[in-house]
Amino acid sequence: PEVGQVDLMTRRIVDTNVSEDYAEPVEQLSDTARIMRIDCGEEGYLPKEALWDSLDNFADNALVFLNSQARLPDIIHSHYADAGYVGTRLSHQLNIALLYTGHSLGRTKRKRLLASGVKRDVIEQRYNISRRIDAEEEALGVAERIITSTNQEIIEQYGMYDYYTPEKMRVVPPGTDLEKFHPVDGSERDSTIYQDICRFLREPDKPVVLALSRPDQRKNITTLVEAYGESEELKQMANLVIIAGNRDDIRDMDSGAQEVLAEVFITIDTYDLYGKVAYPKHHHADDVPIIYRLAAASGGVFVNPALTEPFGLTLIEAAATGLPILATEDGGPTDIINNCHNGYLIDPLDKKAMADNLIKMLADTDNWKSLAHNGIKGVREHYSWSAHAEKYLKIVKPVVDKSEPLTRMDLRRRPMLYHDRALFTDLDQNLLGNPDSLKEFVRVIQENRRCTTFGIATGRRLDSALKVMRKYHIPLPDV
């Protein structure tokens, strides 16, 4: 009742390769909510990395739409870097408070991709990462409130940015649909998706190690396949099921997805995992809850091996069905496991640790049951949509009422030119040589990043140094 109207603005797409719904300018969701599709550059589908040159056009058309309405919105809430770019312009032009949610952040993605061995120029070419980071910086400077999913985002991810202002940041975990994602009910094996999965497997009754994500390099699917393929014990205990989007002809997919799927299939062939790994070509959105429940019914585990995971909605969905989780230690999974106590965290690049944890979880039936029960209970307590909405409105209300002042930062970036102190240290002897003091050192660096140039000296190769820094949570240096 406190919300009069919600307009979700997104790009209008006219393309025979996607549903005709995406071409509809207006889609009414309820009496008080609708999707408004705004014209933006060319009509066809474009991946988000290719949208940057069209965003000013989107902002102009969005401004025309907003000014044509009976009343202007009280707030603008932008999600991801591209919408942050648009939101900063609309906020300035209309003098409306901006809220911003970055979700996955460019600086964090670049750091993790470098650590996994991807070259800097490849990252730039593939992801337009510099433009993305610039847009994120600008949105952080303009936004009155930054909404995050986890505390880890505030400290470890946003803390890497020039416009890091923790006093403006608020944690509101996303919710999940508990009517759709529910515990096992016995109907799972009657589904078509169960038959699709079984046709890959020699022993389909084994527990399932499940991975479900987009075919994206950042999701680190190949490392999971390698971890499985290198562990004879794990291969004896469980099947591996990979749900990585939908595909007809891989050659028609974008280059990034082609590369990931090619790596996965080559790895399956290298370790001769035929009959042990399922990788169905198609699934529907309605199949996803069933897939989780199939894995839970088998006594399996859901794995999210992503290099970094801003929140981890799939982990919440899996937990709601009673499926224990094993997840990357980088990002939102930390908060989820702290709240739900339903799994373990891993270094996503440590294949042995990944396999060992899976074996431990699959082998101990009593512990598995405890993790499954904890997950169902924890999701209901912490991750329902009603709890999410209530917390969000408590943050928005003082912004709308103007009971808290609108805060816009001076949009002058803080490169090293504006730092008034510097700290340089050796990686192996100084930092790794004193693990007891390392946590305190990291805390001090994080608290002073806005005024301090931080440098690391090392004889290691770049990929080796970044991997060690990630393992010990050492902030990315300026030099």
Predicted regions and their residues:
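Short active-site-proximal "capping" loops at secondary-structure junctions
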Residues: 13-15, 430, 459-464
